[in-house]
């Protein structure tokens, strides 16, 4: 009987034996799955030295072969009882959980090795591939054992049970080798079998697939069947003496089945050995467990290179292909990136025909563009590391149409124009790879030396530099040429600023407004704003005139002239006003020769009014070489070399025009002081003074005499000492004195006009008194307060006595020499009057001005009161 025919017969016999064994032992043992087992001892792990609480269910034994793992918490399989079957439980099975800190043996499917970037030497040919799914934990309430379980596929089947993976509420927590383990077991769930994640092995190495935990070989006997896909590789009983039922003839040479532990090994792995391996554990037909292993077989990482090594193409070409040499099937996963960014997902996602796509070991770039100029990298990655190779792709293009830009050291917007005299720079740029060669064609054909390059400098441009400039760009790689033109405009701003004025027309019946800004290239455009409707206000070049009928409503209305030029836009404003509050102000200035120049300025006389000047009622005729002259607008009269003997007197001005008239007059007098005061300060003297409106003064001299002049003695100018010289606008001065011995000082103020002294002020004497100390000041304050207190007490006593005297009625006879009563009450209250007796003769030093008054005047003679 061959192996395929013997396998079903063996399965049937194993099921019958398991059922009979189960029924025979159902009355001998009972297990309460809802009770919790407490651990009363600790067992030391053989490999790690970890203390694990031992769990002692009745008559459980752990075979010696299960203790080979480095850290184990073993729980023997229990027999199945009818009580358990009647409660919808197919039975419980216990598994060995092996852990070694956080790392297991290299061949264990549970081990998880972090993937490194490059593995030039592979020391372990079999490593678990990274599992992107997170691990889960299983917790059983009774056994108080915990460990970390990686992701695995596990199915448990029992013909007579209602067990499902949803019934398990399991949690296993991985701890360090020195930590303690605890586990709890639910009464309604059995401990699950577990396997590791996907395995990765190199070609020629051994694939080892273990069963973890190792099934209990005790009765009933377990049957293990290994498959790859639907093909049976090996089948046999689990245990040292169990028969081997089947072994795949095609893999007999390199296939080994360890029946003691259920481990399947395939030596000299090839690429076609990759796939999903399944292990089925059948125990007498009562339960069935399925373990799945995903195995990947890889060749060693190859040496890579990209061909061509320096790829070049032009923008708009049909295609460009890059090949990753050294890669082949089974050598890992191939991917492409551009400047470190993955290409496949970004380029092909959502595109019907992606412009970049991978075809085998090649990268195809359809219709390359300039942005494809980058560094391309092919990368091969496997669980054993990765390798990569790169190449720089050059995409030539251009030139694009050149762009000419203008910059000037004076102009903010030179693209429209540049001002004459400025330094102008022309720059030409054209997008091109490789960079394009730039040449210029100037507007001036007489210019022979034209420099090559992207920048053209035009220093101090003038009208001759205006015109058209051409920039030519040529790509030496593609052979293409492009040309662009620029029209350069050179503008010359008119000098100065626009000037506005208004004057009266003939007979003061109209107002004539004028705006001018001559010169410049091109000429400025002038236009009035604010004129009444119907008046022509421009625009006109250079000079603009406008006549408006005179009307009082024009007074105070600003008229603006807007002057536009290529370089700048400027304005000037004139406001016609009627004369109002005309006032003359004298101004004094001193020349270098010491002469005084007096100017009379008329305020409140705006244009279009005209000023007419007169002295003592006679019109003045300035000019003609005389000392009198007028300002340009006629509102200021200048009198040169002013003389106190000839030029003093009355001056007047009359402002008249189309909008009204007004005037003012002033009397010019020599320098003098109208009044002044001398105040005392600490270690200083303070002087303040005033002058009259028409007084002409160019400076003030503060003069002093240290000891003061004798009474009746006349003093000259030389006897006084000048302490300070102040300007004509000053009206006060502070003169510091010696702090220790200030003494007696005599001060006066001398006004001066040019070099001509005026009338000095009256002299005042400054006497410095003794300065009180802080103690004296405090004594004065305290004495004042005490005096006020005594005065208040005396006043209170007087009030009390007065109230007492008023309460008594005197019955004494009237004295014949009684004076007028102090208080004159009405006739009905004569009993309250107190007479005053004075000894004669009475010498009154206070005159009695009004005898009818009710006031009583106090005399210096003794006064006797009748009580």
Swiss-Prot record:
- Name it: V-set and immunoglobulin domain-containing protein 10-like
Keyword rRNA-binding attributed:
no
Compositionally biased residues, Basic and acidic residues: 159-170
Start and end residues of each Ig-like C2-type domain: 302-394, 402-487
Q: Which UniProt keywords apply?
A: Disulfide bond, Glycoprotein, Immunoglobulin domain, Membrane, Repeat, Signal, Transmembrane, Transmembrane helix
Instruction: Classify the main location.
Output: membrane
Q: Which gene encodes it?
A: VSIG10L
Annotated region Disordered: where? 35-60, 104-186, 602-627
Keyword match Cell division: no
* Species this protein is from: Homo sapiens (Human)
TM spans (from-to): 777-797
């Amino acid at each position: 009987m061959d192996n395929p025919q013997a396998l079903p017969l063996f399965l049937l016999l194993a099921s019958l034996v398991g059922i009979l064994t189960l029924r025979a032992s159902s009355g001998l043992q009972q297990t309460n799955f809802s009770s919790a087992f407490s651990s009363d001892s600790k067992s030391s792990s053989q490999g790690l030295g970890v203390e694990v609480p031992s769990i002692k269910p009745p008559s459980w034994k752990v075979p010696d072969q299960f203790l080979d793992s480095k850290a184990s918490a073993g729980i023997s399989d229990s027999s199945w009882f009818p009580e358990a079957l009647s409660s919808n439980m197919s039975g419980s099975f216990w598994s060995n959980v092996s852990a070694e800190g956080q790392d297991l043996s290299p061949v264990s499917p549970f081990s998880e090795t972090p993937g490194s970037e490059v593995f030039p030497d592979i020391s372990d040919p079999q490593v678990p591939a990274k599992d992107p799914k997170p691990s889960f934990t299983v917790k059983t309430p009774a056994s108080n054992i915990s460990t970390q379980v990686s992701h695995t596929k596990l199915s448990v089947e029992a013909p007579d049970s209602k067990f499902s993976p949803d019934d398990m509420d399991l949690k296993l927590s991985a701890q360090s080798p020195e930590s303690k383990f605890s586990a709890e077991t639910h009464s309604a769930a059995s401990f699950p079998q577990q396997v590791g994640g996907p395995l990765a092995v190199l070609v020629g190495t051994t694939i080892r697939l273990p069963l973890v935990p190792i099934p209990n070989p005790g009765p009933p006997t377990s049957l293990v069947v290994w498959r790859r896909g639907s093909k049976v590789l090996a089948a046999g009983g689990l245990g040292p003496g169990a028969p081997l039922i089947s072994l795949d003839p095609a893999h007999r040479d390199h296939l080994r089945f360890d029946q003691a532990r259920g481990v399947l090994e395939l030596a000299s792995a090839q690429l076609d050995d990759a796939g999903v391996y399944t292990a089925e554990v059948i125990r007498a037909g009562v339960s069935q467990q399925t373990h799945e292993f995903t195995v990947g077989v890889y060749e060693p990482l190859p040496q890579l290179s990209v061909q061509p090594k320096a790829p070049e193409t032009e923008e708009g070409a049909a295609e460009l292909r890059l090949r990753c040499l050294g890669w082949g099937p089974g050598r890992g996963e191939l991917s492409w990136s551009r400047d470190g960014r993955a290409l496949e997902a970004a380029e092909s996602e959502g595109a019907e025909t992606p412009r970049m796509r991978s075809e085998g070991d090649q990268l195809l770039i359809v219709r390359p563009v300039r942005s494809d100029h980058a560094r391309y990298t092919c990368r091969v990655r496997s669980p054993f590391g990765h390798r990569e190779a790169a190449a720089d792709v050059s995409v030539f293009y251009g030139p694009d149409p050149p762009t000419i830009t203008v910059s000037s050291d004076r102009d903010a917007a030179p693209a429209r124009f540049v001002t004459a005299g400025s330094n102008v720079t022309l720059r030409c740029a054209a997008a091109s790879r490789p960079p394009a060669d730039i040449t210029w064609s100037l507007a001036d054909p007489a210019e022979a030396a034209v420099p090559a390059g992207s920048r053209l400098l035009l220093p101090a441009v003038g009208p001759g530099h205006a015109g058209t400039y051409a920039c030519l760009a040529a790509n030496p790689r593609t052979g293409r040429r492009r040309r662009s033109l620029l029209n350069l405009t050179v503008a010359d701003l008119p000098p100065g600023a626009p000037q506005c004025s208004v004057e009266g027309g003939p007979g003061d019946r109209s107002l004539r407004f004028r705006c001018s800004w001559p010169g410049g290239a091109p000429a400025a455009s002038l236009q009035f704003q604010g004129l009444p409707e119907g008046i022509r206000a421009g625009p006109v070049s250079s000079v603009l005139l406008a006549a408006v009928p005179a009307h009082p409503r024009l007074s105070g209305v600003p008229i603006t002239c807007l002057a536009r030029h290529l370089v700048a836009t400027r304005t000037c404003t004139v406001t016609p006003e009627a004369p109002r509050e005309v006032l003359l102000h004298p101004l004094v200035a001193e020349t270098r020769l010491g002469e005084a120049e007096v100017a009379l300025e008329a305020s409140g006389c705006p244009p279009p009014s005209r000023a007419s000047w007169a002295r003592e009622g006679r019109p003045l005729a300035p000019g003609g070489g005389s000392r009198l002259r007028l300002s340009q607008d006629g509102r200021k009269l200048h009198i040169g070399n002013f003389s106190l003997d000839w030029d003093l007197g009355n001056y007047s001005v009359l402002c008249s025009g189309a909008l009204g008239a007004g005037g003012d007059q002033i009397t010019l007098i020599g320098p003098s002081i109208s009044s002044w005061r001398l105040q005392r300060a600490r270690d200083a003297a303070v002087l303040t003074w005033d002058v009259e409106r028409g007084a002409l003064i160019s400076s003030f001299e503060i003069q002093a005499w240290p000891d003061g002049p004798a009474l009746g003695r006349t003093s000259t100018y030389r006897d006084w000492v000048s302490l300070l010289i102040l300007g004509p606008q000053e009206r006060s001065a502070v003169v510091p004195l010696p702090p220790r011995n200030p003494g007696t000082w005599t001060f006066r103020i001398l006004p001066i006009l040019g070099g001509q002294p005026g009338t000095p002020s009256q002299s005042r004497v400054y006497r410095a008194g003794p300065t009180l100390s802080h103690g004296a000041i405090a004594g004065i304050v305290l004495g004042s307060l005490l005096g006020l207190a005594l005065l208040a007490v005396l006043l209170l006593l007087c009030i009390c006595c007065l109230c007492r005297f008023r309460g008594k009625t005197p019955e004494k006879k009237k004295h014949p020499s009684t004076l007028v009563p102090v208080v004159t009450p009405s006739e009905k209250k004569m009993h309250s009057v107190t007479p005053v007796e004075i000894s004669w003769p009475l010498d009154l030093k206070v005159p009695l001005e009004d005898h009818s008054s009710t006031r009583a005047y106090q005399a210096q003679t003794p006064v006797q009161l009748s009580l």
